[in-house]
Amino acid sequence: MKFFLIFLVIFPIMGVLGKKNGYAVDSSGKVSECLLNNYCNNICTKVYYATSGYCCLLSCYCFGLDDDKAVLKIKDATKSYCDVQIIG
């Protein structure tokens, strides 16, 4: 019973404090275009304050964006493809 009550208290907090992944958009609704991963990592971490980023399908894909940051609406297949972070 105690476990169930703890679960009910902690579960909503996890949803509020969660981070999201996606193509971050600027104030004009455009995504940063790219060819190199290092460029995207700099854009994502310094401009959008994400934890990291890389170039996925010629646009910067950011990991660990705050919930209040706007992201581009994409298909689930594209999101699952880009969620696999390339090492290197």
Swiss-Prot record:
Q: Where is the LCN-type CS-alpha/beta domain?
A: 20-83
The record's comment about this protein's domains reads: Has the structural arrangement of an alpha-helix connected to antiparallel beta-sheets by disulfide bonds (CS-alpha/beta).
Asked whether the keyword Transcription regulation is assigned, the reply is no
Residues annotated as carrying Isoleucine amide in the record are I87
User: What Pfam family does this protein match (any one)?
Assistant: Toxin_3
Q: Which residues form the signal peptide?
A: 1-18
Q: Name one GO biological process term.
A: defense response
Q: Where in the cell is it found?
A: Secreted
State the family it belongs to: Belongs to the long (4 C-C) scorpion toxin superfamily. Sodium channel inhibitor family. Beta subfamily.
Coiled coil segments of this chain: none
Q: Name one GO molecular function term.
A: toxin activity
For this UniProt record, give its keywords in alphabetical order, as a comma-separated list: Amidation, Disulfide bond, Ion channel impairing toxin, Neurotoxin, Secreted, Signal, Toxin, Voltage-gated sodium channel impairing toxin
Q: In which tissues is it expressed?
A: Expressed by the venom gland.
Q: What does this protein do?
A: Excitatory insect beta-toxins induce a spastic paralysis. They bind voltage-independently at site-4 of sodium channels (Nav) and shift the voltage of activation toward more negative potentials thereby affecting sodium channel activation and promoting spontaneous and repetitive firing. This toxin is active only on insects.
SUPFAM superfamilies linked: Scorpion toxin-like
Q: Which cysteines are joined by disulfide bonds?
A: C34-C55, C40-C60, C44-C62, C56-C82
Q: Which PROSITE patterns match?
A: LCN_CSAB (PS51863)
Instruction: Report the GO terms under cellular component.
Output: extracellular region
Q: What is this protein called?
A: Beta-insect excitatory toxin BmKIT1
InterPro entries from the UniProt entry = LCN-type_CS_alpha_beta_dom, Scorpion_toxin-like, Scorpion_toxin-like_sf, Scorpion_toxinL/defensin
The protein's superkingdom reads Eukaryota
| The UniProt record lists the keyword Secreted | yes
Q: Which SMART domains has this protein been placed in?
A: Knot1
